Structure formats: C-alpha cells, structure tokens
C-alpha cells in the first residue's frame, strides 16, 4: 500500500491552545488546527503566537495539521 503524500504549507501561529495545539493562519488564507511534531517536542522548541511555521496537512482532512518546523525570524540590519 502506497503512503499518501502530505501537503506542505507555511503560515503564522495566531493562537496557542492547551495540549500543545495551535491555530495557524496559512498563506492561502485558511485557518487550521495543528499540533507539534515529535522532534519539536523532544528538542523543547518553543512556539509562540506570531511565529512563522511549516505545516504538514493530510489530503484527507485539510482542517488539521502538524507543525514540522519553526522558521527563523528575519533579522533587521540597522
């Protein structure tokens, strides 16, 4: 049986919910409910509202996803 391909998207965390769950506003305008992946949980990476993240979505349910990476904030040079 072939494994289904996941949909990778980027977005911004807009709300932090209980149990390591977040509401993310994707670049295409959708809002999805996400949880964090095991590697992020294991390495104690903090995710806060306003952070830019990469999200994996299942093709079966596009309203739920998994945060796989927290993108670095752009540094401003003075």
UniProtKB/Swiss-Prot annotation:
<keyword id="KW-0396">Initiation factor</keyword>
<dbReference type="Pfam" id="PF01176">
    <property type="entry name" value="eIF-1a"/>
</dbReference>
<comment type="similarity">
    <text>Belongs to the IF-1 family.</text>
</comment>
<dbReference type="InterPro" id="IPR003029">
    <property type="entry name" value="S1_domain"/>
</dbReference>
<comment type="function">
    <text>One of the essential components for the initiation of protein synthesis. Stabilizes the binding of IF-2 and IF-3 on the 30S subunit to which N-formylmethionyl-tRNA(fMet) subsequently binds. Helps modulate mRNA selection, yielding the 30S pre-initiation complex (PIC). Upon addition of the 50S ribosomal subunit IF-1, IF-2 and IF-3 are released leaving the mature 70S translation initiation complex.</text>
</comment>
<dbReference type="InterPro" id="IPR012340">
    <property type="entry name" value="NA-bd_OB-fold"/>
</dbReference>
<dbReference type="GO" id="GO:0009507">
    <property type="term" value="C:chloroplast"/>
</dbReference>
<keyword id="KW-0934">Plastid</keyword>
<comment type="subunit">
    <text>Component of the 30S ribosomal translation pre-initiation complex which assembles on the 30S ribosome in the order IF-2 and IF-3, IF-1 and N-formylmethionyl-tRNA(fMet); mRNA recruitment can occur at any time during PIC assembly.</text>
</comment>
<keyword id="KW-0694">RNA-binding</keyword>
<dbReference type="InterPro" id="IPR004368">
    <property type="entry name" value="TIF_IF1"/>
</dbReference>
<keyword id="KW-0648">Protein biosynthesis</keyword>
<keyword id="KW-0150">Chloroplast</keyword>
<keyword id="KW-0699">rRNA-binding</keyword>
<dbReference type="InterPro" id="IPR006196">
    <property type="entry name" value="RNA-binding_domain_S1_IF1"/>
</dbReference>
<protein>
    <recommendedName>
        <fullName>Translation initiation factor IF-1, chloroplastic</fullName>
    </recommendedName>
</protein>
<feature type="domain" description="S1-like">
    <location>
        <begin position="1"/>
        <end position="72"/>
    </location>
</feature>
<dbReference type="GO" id="GO:0043022">
    <property type="term" value="F:ribosome binding"/>
</dbReference>
<dbReference type="GO" id="GO:0003743">
    <property type="term" value="F:translation initiation factor activity"/>
</dbReference>
<dbReference type="GO" id="GO:0019843">
    <property type="term" value="F:rRNA binding"/>
</dbReference>
């Amino acid at each position: 049986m072939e494994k289904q391909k996941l949909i990778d998207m980027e977005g911004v965390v807009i709300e932090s919910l209980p149990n390591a769950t977040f509401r993310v506003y994707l670049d295409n305008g959708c809002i999805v409910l996400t949880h964090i992946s095991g590697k992020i949980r294991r390495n104690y990476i903090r995710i806060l509202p306003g952070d830019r993240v990469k999200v994996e979505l299942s093709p079966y349910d596009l309203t739920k996803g998994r945060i796989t990476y927290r993108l670095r904030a752009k540094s401003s040079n003075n």
